[in-house]
């Protein structure tokens, strides 16, 4: 089975998360996408982070697709960093082929992630374009360091079968939603106050 992993705080989850997942399911020919709702993000201030249970329920409501599974795995296995989550999944679920899914905004700062080179060496990565982040993402330290492992976009369906490091930059999905834009200044979710 080919499984896409979309990690994040989902604070709040929104239609773009579902659209990204459905886009990845189709373009990467995945069987499932797992939303890994993190208990906290080491690169962000977590003061306005809603309770994990509330984010999980909201994510389930938004996902609304049987191929998208919402998980609090990182809380259960007590991992803080993506590399630890990926290593645990690969060790426990050896028969699955994983692809890490991220937006172009995350590629732009991927070099700040804990053990980002090891992440790239453990699992293929699909980067979903998020204009206007395209240039910044493709000019980022991580994109430059991994440039020789980039697949042409027309080979995206082969990504799950490629040994890491391998990555693809997928264009064509035009979305202008972000969790940051859906939060009020006090951290509450817009429309949920």
UniProtKB/Swiss-Prot annotation:
CDD domains: NMNAT (cd02165). Disulfide bonds: none annotated. Transmembrane segments: none annotated. Keywords: ATP-binding, NAD, Nucleotide-binding, Nucleotidyltransferase, Pyridine nucleotide biosynthesis, Transferase. It comes from the Bacteria. GO terms for biological process: NAD biosynthetic process. Its EC number is 2.7.7.18. It catalyses: nicotinate beta-D-ribonucleotide + ATP + H(+) = deamido-NAD(+) + diphosphate. GO terms for molecular function: ATP binding; nicotinate-nucleotide adenylyltransferase activity. Gene3D superfamilies: HUPs. Pathway: Cofactor biosynthesis; NAD(+) biosynthesis; deamido-NAD(+) from nicotinate D-ribonucleotide: step 1/1. InterPro entries: Cyt_trans-like, NadD/NMNAT, Rossmann-like_a/b/a_fold. The keyword Metal-binding does not apply. It is an enzyme of class 2 (transferase). Belongs to the NadD family. PANTHER family: NICOTINATE-NUCLEOTIDE ADENYLYLTRANSFERASE-RELATED, PHOSPHOPANTETHEINE ADENYLYLTRANSFERASE. Catalyzes the reversible adenylation of nicotinate mononucleotide (NaMN) to nicotinic acid adenine dinucleotide (NaAD). This is Probable nicotinate-nucleotide adenylyltransferase. It comes from Bradyrhizobium diazoefficiens (strain JCM 10833 / BCRC 13528 / IAM 13628 / NBRC 14792 / USDA 110).
């Amino acid at each position: 089975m080919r499984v896409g992993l979309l990690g994040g705080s989902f604070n709040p989850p929104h239609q773009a998360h579902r659209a990204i997942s459905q886009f990845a399911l189709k373009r990467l020919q995945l069987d499932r996408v797992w939303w890994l709702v993190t208990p906290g993000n080491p690169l962000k201030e977590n003061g306005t982070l809603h309770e994990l249970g509330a984010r999980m329920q909201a994510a389930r409501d938004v996902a609304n697709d049987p191929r998208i599974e919402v998980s609090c795995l990182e809380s259960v296995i007590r991992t803080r960093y993506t590399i630890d989550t990926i290593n645990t999944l690969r060790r426990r679920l050896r028969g699955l082929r994983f692809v890490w899914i991220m937006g172009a905004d995350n590629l732009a700062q991927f070099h700040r992630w804990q053990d980002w080179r090891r992440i790239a060496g453990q699992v293929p990565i699909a980067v979903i374009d998020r204009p206007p982040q395209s240039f910044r993402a493709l000019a980022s330290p991580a994109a430059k360091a991994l440039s020789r492992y980039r697949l042409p976009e027309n080979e995206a369906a082969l990504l799950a079968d490629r040994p890491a490091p391998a990555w693809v930059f997928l264009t064509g999905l035009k979305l202008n939603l972000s969790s940051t834009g859906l939060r009020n200044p006090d951290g509450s979710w817009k429309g949920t106050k």
